[in-house]
């Protein structure tokens, strides 16, 4: 299954670079805390985060070598999504690796999540954003189980 492969890839890349500072955007319950060195998790709604703040309001002094956004940049208009991507890129050092999982606009399986509207991600949008933001695309693929879009960027 692709998600397991993606998580293994992320874990291996971060284990191979233990000195990297890593940002987990929308970390939720912060499940990677203690598993990834030098990890900072931000989330506007979950107290398990290191810092409870929306992405666009996060302005740290340091920059990051790796970034995770595994389902957190999924809500709002095209302009909001692009602004969040642009801000995420600005938080990274040159050569940083950015791992994303995006919902292509599909509803969640759980009834309590039916009210959530997801941005309709597709590969063309990812490519266009990468071009506009000046990042390299290292990988892009779709999960065959839940149709999530996975992509990896590298900053220049």
Where in the sequence are the language-model features?
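Class I (Rossmann-like) S-adenosyl-L-methionine-dependent methyltransferase catalytic domain
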Residues: 1-59, 87, 97-156
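A conserved beta-strand element that flanks and buttresses the S-adenosyl-L-methionine
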Residues: 68
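Hydrophobic adenine-recognition pocket in adenosine-nucleotide-binding enzymes
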Residues: 72
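A short, conserved alpha-helix within the catalytic core of class I
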Residues: 75-87
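Helix-to-beta-strand junctions that scaffold the AdoMet/dcAdoMet cofactor pocket
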Residues: 76-77, 92-94
């Amino acid at each position: 299954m692709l998600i397991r492969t993606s998580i293994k890839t992320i874990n291996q890349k971060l284990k191979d670079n233990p000195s990297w500072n890593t940002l987990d955007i929308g970390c939720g319950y912060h499940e990677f805390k203690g598993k990834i060195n030098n990890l900072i998790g931000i989330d506007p709604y979950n107290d398990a985060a290191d810092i409870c703040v929306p992405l666009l309001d996060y302005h740290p002094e340091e920059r990051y070598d790796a970034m995770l956004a595994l389902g957190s940049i999924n809500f709002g208009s095209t302009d909001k999504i692009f602004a969040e991507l642009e801000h995420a890129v600005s938080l990274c050092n040159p050569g940083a690796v950015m791992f994303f999982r995006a919902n292509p606009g599909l509803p969640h399986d759980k009834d309590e999540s039916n009210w959530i509207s997801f941005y309709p991600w597709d590969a063309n949008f990812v490519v266009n954003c990468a071009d506009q933001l000046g990042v390299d695309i290292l990988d892009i693929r779709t999960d065959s189980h839940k149709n999530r879009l996975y992509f990896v960027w590298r900053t220049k």
